[in-house]
A protein has these predicted regions:
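AMP-binding/adenylate-forming catalytic core of the ANL superfamily
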Residues: 1-63, 72-75, 80-89, 94
Length: 97
């Protein structure tokens, strides 16, 4: 099992990262894989490939997100909580198209 909070913790500790969310999306070969959605700190430039490469030094291969996206903001509900269900829906077709 992969625990999103563990991977998010590693990503959030990276230089230039303001916040991240990890969601599971369907994959034809693996059933489900992780996709990281990251917000950069103001003025920082993040490269998705650099984020996944940095994670390889700290995490087991099966825990590394298969894809990483840098976005301006994460969807939130009225309480301020990240709406991971919306992220799952947004990226659900990545590996099945």
């Amino acid at each position: 099992n992969v625990y999103p909070a563990e991977i998010e913790g590693y990503i959030n500790d990276m230089s230039g990262v303001a916040e991240s969310a990890l969601v599971g999306v369907p994959h034809p070969d693996f059933g489900e894989v992780g996709v990281a959605v990251v917000i950069a700190k103001p003025g920082a430039t993040l490269q998705p490939d650099a984020i996944t490469a940095a994670l390889k030094a700290s995490l087991a291969n099966f825990k590394i997100p298969k894809r990483c996206f840098v976005v301006a903001e994460l969807p939130r509900n009225t309480m301020g909580k990240v709406q991971k269900n919306l992220l799952r829906n947004q990226y659900a077709g990545l590996f099945t198209a």
